[in-house]
A protein has these predicted regions:
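Extended, low-complexity, charge-balanced
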Residues: 7-17, 21, 84-88, 95-105
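Long, compositionally biased intrinsically disordered regulatory segments in eukaryotic proteins
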Residues: 3-4, 32-36, 65, 75, ...
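Generic alpha-helical secondary structure signal
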Residues: 41, 81, 85, 105, ...
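C-terminal charged interaction modules
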Residues: 92-165
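Short, charged/polar N-terminal "headpieces" of proteins
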Residues: 1-62, 149, 153-158, 164-165
């Protein structure tokens, strides 16, 4: 019985381990294929949706501030309660956007069992911009150069073959 195996090159895989607040490795990680053709599009979509979500939250807060406030039946006034609900909705949308980029349950991995808190999104944003984005090399010129380097010879040979005909 002959068994053959193949293995793809993993040199373009960025794997980021996750540690607890105490610095203990959780065994969880985020993984990015730096040659994924859709990665630049997902990163761009993350930035666009993040901007859209923040604008929507800002508009909601402005509308709430313009309304007359009414004393609530509980601890908060009606406007305060509506602001908390708007922020909660914003957080849920942002988690969806971040998971679209980080991968399934990416936010949960980063939170390490903690619940989403007031500063969690800011922490995740810093992780993406300072620790992940610099590795992505998402500029179109870099992508074009990689394609030319990888397929340039084949393209040149095809041009020469076509000229001979």
């Amino acid at each position: 019985m002959i068994e053959n195996y193949i293995q793809l090159n993993k040199s373009s895989i960025l794997r980021l381990g996750i540690k607890t607040d105490e610095g203990i490795d959780t065994g969880e990680f985020l993984e990015f294929n730096l040659e994924d053709i859709e990665l630049p599009l997902r990163f761009q979509e993350l930035l666009e949706k993040d901007k859209k979500n923040k604008e929507h939250l800002r508009n909601q807060m402005l509308m709430i501030d313009k309304r007359e406030d009414v004393k609530g039946k509980k601890l908060m006034s009606k406007n305060e309660e509506d602001k908390i609900k708007a922020i909660n909705e914003f957080f849920k949308k942002e988690v969806e956007v971040y998971n679209m980029f980080l991968g399934e349950k990416g936010v949960e991995k980063l939170l390490n069992g903690r619940k989403l808190g007031w500063t969690s999104l800011q922490e995740i944003d810093e992780i993406i911009t300072k620790q992940i984005a610099p590795h992505l090399d998402l500029k179109m010129t870099n992508i074009t150069d990689k394609i030319k380097n990888k397929y340039g010879e084949a393209i040149q040979r095809n041009k020469e073959v076509l000229k001979d005909e």
